[in-house]
UniProtKB/Swiss-Prot annotation:
This is UDP-N-acetylenolpyruvoylglucosamine reductase. One of its GO terms (biological process) is regulation of cell shape. Its EC number is 1.3.1.98. The keyword Cytoplasm applies. Disulfide bonds: none annotated. SUPFAM superfamilies: FAD-binding/transporter-associated domain-like (SSF56176), Uridine diphospho-N-Acetylenolpyruvylglucosamine reductase, MurB, C-terminal domain (SSF56194). The active site is at R216, S299, E425. Belongs to the MurB family. It is found in: Cytoplasm.
Amino acid sequence: MTDSTNNAHFTSEERARHLLERLSGTGADSVSIPGTRVTSRSFAEMTTLRIGAAPAGVVECSSAEAVAQVVSFLDAHTQPLLIVGGGSNLVVGEGDEVSQLVVVLMSAGGGEGGVDKKGAAEKSAEGDVMIDRETGVVRAFAGVEWDQLVAATVEAGLGGLECLSGIPGSVGATPVQNVGAYGAEVAQVLRRVQLYDRTRGELEWVDPSALDLGYRYSNLKFTSRAVVTAVEFQLTTDGLSVPLRFGELARRLGVDADEAAAGEIRRPATDVRQAVLELRAGKGMVLDSADHDTWSAGSFFTNPIVTGEEARDAVVAAVREKCGDAEAESMPLYSVKSSGGDASGGGAGASVGEPQYKFSAAWLIERAGFAKGWHVPGNERASLSTKHTLALTNRGSATSADVVELARAVRTGVREAFGVVLEPEPIWVGVSID
């Protein structure tokens, strides 16, 4: 039988539509893949920033096998595609590049994001989530909502994810970005990751060591070679949190600063989760459709990392010149482990063992003159959050151009003030900050 999709007279849009018809079972040479559904949505509906045009179509997938089969089918026809989970780390444009895409949307099945909260012995390895209370091993389909997984693990008496409570998005994005907050990151509890290798056409489990994990980075972040389909974590079974090292969170829980610095203090994971949710809500970092401060891609810039004492001292000197001695002495500045030259942000090119130093992007943004709620003069459609300077927000009618204009203004201002180039954290589709 001839594959009608290979018709050379198809335009890009026509080819995408024809492939979607085949996947939906309504076109010629229809393809039936269990656990899939073809639908139409705009990126404004699929992302937390709520901007972006509509792609050619959306294929919802409710299992790793469905994702693998759909991606394989689209790749076989050289169809441009984008994998989307919670849409919390995307900035999407409105041009032709976007309208020609087919989105493969990870969508967990069942209620509460597919999280089964029964005893470990009753859990099915074929479900969206498997939690083993005895060993602390947790496995989740990539499409499960992240915070619902965190809530389920805390409720099950496991510790390790509580500091990452309230982060929007899906499980599959967490190892790609090496998601982190309040002194914890996914790399600390990651056991293994299931990938669909698009080159070999195979599903496989890989160890964290294969991902080159760094600060808000993995080697999956800027490549389309593989798709995360499931993630497995190793959590603790004593019901206690990870050590409380982040000052703001430690203070919220009544932990002395010196004790927190020692990195030995742990608290019940349930208490830590509640404290984190309260802190995030106060910064507009918990999704609320009625609050434009939450219409964002989360923390927009990564905390900059510089290599070597000379680079560190240059930033401190610039702060001292602009803001005075008191600010220079009290600015947030942390020594971090050398990345050995990976692309994890700021530390690229560092030799092994060379000291690296991390600054607070939010602190630098504010000291460069960008207050909470700041917007480009004459354009109020996009602004910094009124609660947190690190979030760039859609005030209700912003386009990608508005967000880019705001991001460029902030990045330029920080560079001119302190000589630091802020790196954006989101993935850009059909639009660029450069």
